[in-house]
Amino acid sequence: MVRYRCCRSQSRSRCRRRRRRCRRRRRRCCQRRRVRKCCRRTYTLRCRRY
């Protein structure tokens, strides 16, 4: 199974708009590719494979 972790390439201002949604779901990072959801702590939008 491929996992993704947070990447800080996106601007935080865009991330803050989705802050509530992200906190509610409690996801640290995106689970799929190209899915724009904030990470739980850093609130970044993109994820990187690892």
From Swiss-Prot:
Name of protein: Sperm protamine P1
Lineage: superkingdom: Eukaryota
One GO CC annotation: nucleosome
Record carries keyword Repressor: no
InterPro entries assigned: Protamine_P1
Pfam families found in the cross-reference section: Protamine_P1
GO biological process per UniProt: chromosome condensation; sperm DNA condensation
Entry similarity comment: Belongs to the protamine P1 family.
Tissue-specific expression: Testis.
Lineage: Eukaryota, Metazoa, Chordata, Craniata, Vertebrata
Keywords assigned by UniProt, alphabetized: Chromosome, Developmental protein, Differentiation, Disulfide bond, DNA condensation, DNA-binding, Nucleosome core, Nucleus, Spermatogenesis
Leader peptide range in chain numbering: none
GO molecular-function term, one example from the UniProt record: DNA binding
Chief location category: nucleus
Assembly description: Cross-linked by interchain disulfide bonds around the DNA-helix.
Function (record text): Protamines substitute for histones in the chromatin of sperm during the haploid phase of spermatogenesis. They compact sperm DNA into a highly condensed, stable and inactive complex.
Disulfide linkage: 7-15, 39-47
Localization (cell): Nucleus; Chromosome
